[in-house]
A protein has these predicted regions:
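An accessory alpha-helical subdomain
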Residues: 131-183, 314, 318-363
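A cross-family "folded-core" feature that marks the main globular domain of proteins
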Residues: 43-44, 54-55, 62, 70-73, ...
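Conserved nucleotide-sensing/catalytic segment adjacent to the nucleotide-binding pocket
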Residues: 7-24, 60-124, 131, 245-324
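N-terminal pre-Walker A segment at the start of P-loop NTPase domains
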Residues: 5-32, 171, 175, 179-216
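Glycine-rich phosphate-binding P-loop
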Residues: 40-59, 209-245
Length: 367
């Protein structure tokens, strides 16, 4: 069961920038830093010290001015923000603490640290040092257990992908992509420079898999949806479409698969054409009106694939149970984190946090 977040605001979209994968935490904060001309503001402070609230305020201010933004949600708690990207300003403010620690490469030049540590009363925290340390350790242990379940699910899903790959006609996929791109991606004027943003459209969270369908509706009016239960065909389709879009000079938003981010793309946006190529499966059902649906079984020898039926069914059932268990452990870790926040919140001077928020608004031209 996948939660889809539906709020459609064309000037404000939602993504993740990191998630727990079978290989551990995978973040795209560094590629964001390397996007051309991106000015980074790196927030440092403890849990419950107002980082997310500060960023939410800045996001609202930008929205009120009609500025396009991307809200970056935290996969451990999707109601909380890990960052806000201000597209017109080429600026981003992000939570630069674990598990996505960032330090400035060029302090002051392209990055500024926004420290909120001065808002903490260390003496008040020190009185609860043992309890705070215990909760940090417990949170880490629960997240590690969740990661192991995600890793197990990942290996089963990879096994299914390999089974489908044994039955797929990849030459047919290549010919199809050539025709599709000729039809949907008009050639741009000579010298158009291609660029790419990496974002996650879905993630495994304490609420289960979350998919930001509202972002799709905000960024595109035309949808080509590849229905692929196992991922081998859609993986090649998206890889080839990405290469073709970049070769033709388009700016694209590439959304890696949250389970196998290093070798599989799930979705791709071409904002200039308001066009999206999407993968639809049980983990993130697309369910949008007026889509051009492509069933990936057309590229597969179904008779051959039928020989794997029992194995594929087992993998799907077992992976679903493992991911359910992972979400449950993540929910326990979040409850632990919430308890940790109560200690920090009691030790924070929120007047000073408000001052820092006003300073940030000034730096970003949102005052």
């Amino acid at each position: 069961r996948c939660l889809s977040m539906n709020a459609v605001r064309s000037n404000s979209v939602d993504f993740f920038l990191g998630t727990t994968t079978p290989a551990g935490f995978k973040g795209y904060f560094e590629p964001l830093r390397r996007e051309p001309g991106m000015q980074m503001y790196l927030i440092k402070s403890g849990p419950g010290c107002g980082k997310s609230t500060l960023m939410k305020r800045l996001a609202v201010k930008a929205e009120q001015k009609g500025e396009p933004i991307q809200r970056i949600h935290c996969a451990s708690d999707p109601d909380s923000l890990d960052g806000v990207i201000f597209l017109d300003k080429r600026a981003a403010i992000v939570d630069a603490t674990a598990p996505h620690v960032m330090e400035p490469d060029a302090p002051g030049a392209e990055e500024q640290v926004v420290s909120l540590y001065h808002t903490l009363d260390a003496d008040a925290l020190h009185a609860h040092a043992d309890e705070v340390k215990r909760l940090f350790a417990q949170n880490t242990a629960l997240r590690s257990r969740a990661a192991r379940y995600i890793a197990s699910a990942g290996s089963l899903l990879l096994d299914s992908r390999r089974a489908e790959a044994c039955s797929a006609n990849f030459e047919k996929v290549r010919r199809y992509v050539k025709r599709l791109c000729a039809r949907t991606l008009p050639r741009l004027p000579e010298g158009a420079s291609a660029s790419e943003e990496l974002r996650l459209l879905s993630a495994i969270t304490p609420k289960g898999p979350v998919f930001y369908r509202g972002t799709v509706q905000a960024l595109a009016d035309r949808y080509v949806v590849f229905h692929d239960d196992y991922g081998a065909v859609s993986r090649l389709l998206l890889e080839l479409i990405r290469a073709e879009a970049l070769a033709r000079g388009y700016h694209i938003i590439t959304c890696p698969c949250a389970m196998h981010p290093d070798d599989k793309i799930d979705h791709l946006f071409i904002p200039a054409l308001r066009l999206a190529f999407l993968t639809d499966n049980r983990w993130h059902p697309v369910q949008l009106p007026g889509v051009q649906a492509v069933r990936c079984t057309r590229f597969v020898d179904r008779e051959n694939l039928a020989g794997y039926r029992a194995r594929l069914r087992f993998n799907e059932r077992a992976a679903a149970e493992l991911l359910e268990q992972a979400a449950d452990l993540m929910a326990q870790a979040k409850a632990c984190h919430d308890e940790l926040e109560t200690y920090y919140r009691a030790a924070v001077d929120f007047g000073k946090v408000d001052e820092a928020a006003a300073q940030c608004a000034g730096m970003l031209g949102l005052a």
